Amino acid sequence: MSRRGTAEEKTAKSDPIYRNRLVNMLVNRILKHGKKSLAYQIIYRAVKKIQQKTETNPLSVLRQAIHGVTPGIAVKARRVGGSTHQVPIEIGSTQGKALAIRWLLAASRKRPGRNMAFKLSSELVDAAKGSGDAIRKREETHRMAEANRAFAHFR
């Protein structure tokens, strides 16, 4: 048994303009090659575009989109007796938000469009409305978990 203690969970810092942790999590996931200022630019432009499209509070749209995409359950591959089973496991809120952000960014990168800010804003608005690729990904994950419910006792 390990003698090492459990790692302290780091809380995400908030971003300088909106003072929001979700925005900072989004910035850190969109980041490529250490260009954080560019990541901030993309996020802030996307937030402005959301403001123009919906004429509501863009942070509430962001919160609603992430809440809509966050999965409650996922499947994990587990090897039992020579065969690999997809075992459904519950996901905590922090891990769920991280997955949701990852799916939102992947879906927005796939989208056709002018630039990343435009694609991200479109995906966030769609996710807040309950449509889009990220929502489809969450539903697919939930369907997989439901289909493999018989293997839940392998946890």
Curated annotation (Swiss-Prot):
The keyword Chloroplast applies. GO terms for cellular component: chloroplast; small ribosomal subunit. It comes from the Eukaryota. It is found in: Plastid, Chloroplast. Disulfide bonds: none annotated. Its main location: plastid. Gene3D superfamilies: Ribosomal protein S7 domain. Part of the 30S ribosomal subunit. This is Small ribosomal subunit protein uS7cz/uS7cy.
